[in-house]
């Protein structure tokens, strides 16, 4: 667990809580950021939250986030923000993504952050992919890492 202790609903503008959450998940897993296949973003669809999270993703994953080799998406466009239940529902979606080898869609995105133009951000159609290692970013202070050792599609 990690947190920036900035505000109950607003992240610190430099993304320190999200950076700490994802960095801790990577450290605990023993993985390098380039070894992560999928990231489930918190993506609250708030201007501040999305900007801070995008900054944190770029900081932690650098070129890996924009090259197309890291798939990332969010389920909130499909289900809304379920407040206290959001993390559990995102975890379920992510486990299903791993099980089926399909990154979840990011629905209702009209203008993705231009920094991620070349990233694999499934907006309209799902794409089968081998998901071996994921980071599930559940918000300001929660993170989960899952590493699957299979060499084949799940």
Model regions and ranges:
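Conserved "HGTGT" condensation-loop signature of ketosynthase/thiolase-family condensing enzymes
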Residues: 1-154
């Amino acid at each position: 667990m990690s947190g920036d202790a900035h505000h109950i609903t607003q992240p610190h503008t430099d993304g320190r809580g999200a950076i700490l959450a994802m960095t801790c998940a990577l450290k605990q897993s023993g993985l390098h950021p380039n070894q992560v296949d999928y990231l489930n973003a918190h993506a609250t669809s708030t201007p501040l939250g999305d900007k801070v999270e995008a900054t944190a993703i770029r900081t932690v994953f650098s070129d890996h986030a924009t090259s197309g080799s890291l798939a990332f998406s969010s389920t909130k466009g499909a289900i809304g923000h379920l407040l206290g239940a959001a993390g559990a529902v995102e975890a379920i979606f992510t486990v299903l993504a791993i099980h089926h080898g399909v990154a979840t869609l990011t629905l209702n995105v009209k203008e993705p952050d231009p920094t991620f133009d070349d990233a694999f951000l499934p907006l309209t159609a799902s794409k089968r992919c081998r998901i071996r290692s994921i980071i599930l970013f559940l918000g300001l202070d929660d993170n989960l890492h899952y590493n699957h050792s299979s060499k084949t599609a799940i």
